């Protein structure tokens, strides 16, 4: 799909930042309008992250207009908002391929463009990486500048504050732009603020500020008076002195949709020394009314008709695993007031909207703070409550020490509902749930369950909730299999189920690839086992299968290295059972983006691929 660039005459003149910087500043508002419309048209035809990009159009134009990218380093935190950046950095004609197999990466990606200096996907990494780049630039001595753009959600994470504290301590020259689109920090925006922001970011003010500090540093009373005077002036525009206390010079808030004000303020700040923070106010979904009204719903979208202003409904009548979890959560909370649900800013994605509304006193959204979420849950458990931590597989990686140190060592009854286990699709390498079975399996006291369908998912959630110790239920992104939902009951811990009896080959399946393994088993006349528990492993059943079959095959949608199949290998070796084992799962690579079924086919994890791998191994 390609768009007629003639419909966007100003944008056509800015194929890259060098061309953009040649435009007269009077044309920038027109460029922003065309860029926003181009983004709207492209994403509506191809799908992708949407509302965040609409909100940073003016900022993106201003940054590339003022800074000498790619020589100057521009770092986008998370990267959901980077579509306008990609359009302006030589990738305009390929933007319709974003998030698709072999297309543009959904986030800034170092291997894709010299303008993407940091590969991202997870939040709150920009300031740490930016500080490292700023230190390197200072030692390089070529005048290279460093700019980090971070949102008001991502900046709440501990890592961001750790980085700012370090930056303030070593006084490195860098600019952090706080893109505040949630009104969570300040609503104090207007013409006066824009004017004062330009004044406070100017060279005269900066030189007077630093010169005054040096001149009166030996006179504490005068120094304190000057500091109070400065704070009084800034008090008209600054919502908090937090950033100043961390060692940053705070400027703002500035209207993030006034491209001329942004451009002038950035020019003023470009040559300032020491850490600087520019606070801009933006509207997520800016320029498209439905997205402005519901920025969460329009955060990431399928193909849609811009004229209708509505998103298409899901074609599947089957519930997602996230919805299954959310309904189980509500069902359990109705009977047990001790249940406490915790999520690190993933309410919608984890299926917790209904629960948050019906049981607000039992619901905790701790923001982007995965480490805190897990240890907070540990505290709830110590206090006699029953915490359930709903978290994506890829984000649990960020709380690994807390999982071990604060939950497992103390053998606390915390249930982890791990969503997006396995291949997640369009978000690619940074979001695949490829490693959780591997990194949890080695932790003592953990019970790890992998359901094969939505009914097993419910039973396992129930089992893990009532288990007196740490437990994890790991389920995929996507819809269920239309399994009949049975009354909830405790599953016997560490016991699998024989699904099909065959000959010579026994397929041991962990998780929702069971349906694909079933088809392969039928074609090969193989035995099929739904293992259900990754830990504790059903050792008795594995040894029985080893005794009755010539070969074993393990199947999982997790990294082969250290995964469930590795547990089978370890058991057989420990028991001196010399049975050949084929481990089928995710290979030793970071799996790129692509539709889930598309990537399963490529990796040999669909029915045909499983059968093909087994036949090739036996040949």
Curated annotation (Swiss-Prot):
Reactions it catalyzes: D-glyceraldehyde 3-phosphate + pyruvate + H(+) = 1-deoxy-D-xylulose 5-phosphate + CO2
EC number: 2.2.1.7
Chain residues that bind Mg(2+): 152, 181
UniProt KW Magnesium keyword: yes
GO biological process, one term: 1-deoxy-D-xylulose 5-phosphate biosynthetic process
Enzyme class: transferase
Keywords: Isoprene biosynthesis, Magnesium, Metal-binding, Thiamine biosynthesis, Thiamine pyrophosphate, Transferase
SUPFAM superfamilies documented for this protein: Thiamin diphosphate-binding fold (THDP-binding) (SSF52518), TK C-terminal domain-like (SSF52922)
Cofactor(s), by name: Mg(2+); thiamine diphosphate
HAMAP family reported for this sequence: DXP_synth
Official protein name in the record: 1-deoxy-D-xylulose-5-phosphate synthase
Organism: Yersinia pestis
Gene: dxs
